[in-house]
A protein has these predicted regions:
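Non-catalytic interaction regions
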Residues: 1-277
Length: 277
């Protein structure tokens, strides 16, 4: 990358995640690592869309996930439709008194309910409540819904950032989201994602939005850090033969996944765990 990529390192992994991913976490950590994708999906704000071909698994052999066409992610409204159960982002706002059970129930159709540890799920929820700015924003919407259930409001996920992406990947609380009360026009918000109060449809969220990755993989971005942003400039290097001035998505993830001495980050723990499966 010729030294042209400059983005901040990820923050130190929260103690709970570091413990669960470590070799000294015993049976508890083993349960978590075995079902880490299920735990992440229970806290994800978005759902994956696309044409999944299930016929490939009708014969004997290892499981294969095959998708035709484009892969994309959706996000629904803040509150579920009347008579329906909450899912994904709605779990942070609606019926939070039964939040743990509601999250486990989302996995019923996948047959993994009995493998989920209630204690681990509760501890992860507390960890995200404490550290994750996106979760805090949705909890703010929950509090407004509880105190003013009759009011109509939306949550705005801001696309733009005011600070240099080469130095900061932790946006301030005001840079992440904002509550919109009453009527609004989406034309005023350009590429921001507007999560409406209660609607029937789903809204696609682009993978170029800074909050796309932390909303899809909250256990990899436990602080709600920004993911890739197309507006991050490359570092100026004297006599560089390259004309491109902005960071590409490929360069971003190459930098993130590069092993570095004395850097014990969540990315590397997940890579080490994957190599030992």
């Amino acid at each position: 990358m010729e030294g042209r990529v400059q983005i901040p390192f990820m923050k130190e992994t929260p103690p709970l995640l570091k413990y669960l991913l470590g070799a000294d976490s015993g049976q508890k950590g083993s349960k978590f690592r075995k079902n880490i994708r299920a735990y992440n999906s229970m806290f994800a704000f978005t759902s994956m869309g696309g044409r999944v071909d299930a016929s490939i698994n009708q014969s004997k052999g290892p499981f294969v996930f095959r998708m035709s066409g484009q892969n994309y992610h959706h996000i629904g409204s803040l509150l579920p439709e009347v008579g329906k159960k909450p899912q994904f982002a709605q779990l942070y706002i609606y019926d939070t008194e039964n939040e743990t059970d509601n999250r486990i129930n989302t996995l019923l159709k996948h047959g993994t309910k009995t493998e989920i540890d209630h204690e681990i799920l509760h501890e992860l929820s507390k960890m995200l409540d404490q550290h994750n700015n996106l979760v805090k924003s949705f909890r703010m919407a929950r509090d407004r819904y509880k105190t003013q259930p009759e009011s109509t409001f939306c949550l705005r996920l801001l696309n733009s950032r005011t600070r240099d992406g080469r130095r900061y990947n932790m946006p301030t609380f005001s840079e992440v989201t904002g509550l919109i009360v009453g009527d609004f026009s989406e034309a005023n918000f350009q590429r921001d994602v507007i999560i409406e109060h209660r609607t029937k449809g789903l809204r696609r969220i682009t993978d170029l939005h800074p909050s796309f990755m932390p909303m899809t993989y909250p256990l990899i971005y436990p602080y709600g850090e920004d993911g890739y942003r197309p507006d991050i400039s490359l570092r100026d290097v004297t006599d560089s033969p390259f004309k491109r001035q902005k960071l590409t998505m490929r360069q971003y993830y190459c930098f993130r996944l590069q092993q570095r001495l004395m850097r014990d980050t969540l990315y590397f723990k997940l890579v080490d765990y994957s190599n030992n499966i």
